[in-house]
Amino acid sequence: MSLAITIIDVDAAADNVYVFGTLTASGNYSTGGDTLDFTTVAPQVAASHPPVQVWVGGTTGDNYAWIKGSALNNQMVKINTASNTELGSGAYPARITGDTNIQFEAVFNKLI
C-alpha cells in the first residue's frame, strides 16, 4: 500500500518548489520499498514531473531512503531498521504505523 502524504507547507522558491509534510504508513511493506505516489497531491504542488530530491525521516531509529522513480506515482521509500537491515516484507510494525512524525521534504522543478 502507498504511503499516505499530508502536505504541511509548499515553498515556491526561485527555480524549485519545496514541499514539506508527513507520511503515514499502513498496510504492508514490500521488500525493496513502499510506493510514494505524488499524484495524490500534485495539484497542491503544481507538479507534473517526479521530484528531483526527497528526504524522509522518522523518530523510531529506522532509516528511510528515497528511490527515484520515473513518474509522480512510482517513487519509493525503502526502510532499513536500526540494525541496518531492510524492514521485512509484511505488515508494518506498530513502531512505524504509530510514528506520527515521519517527515518528508520533496524538491520539484518549478513549472514555467
PLM ranges: what are they?
Residues 1-37, 99-112:
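Extracellular receptor-binding modules and their adjoining Ser/Thr/Gly/Asp/Asn-rich linkers
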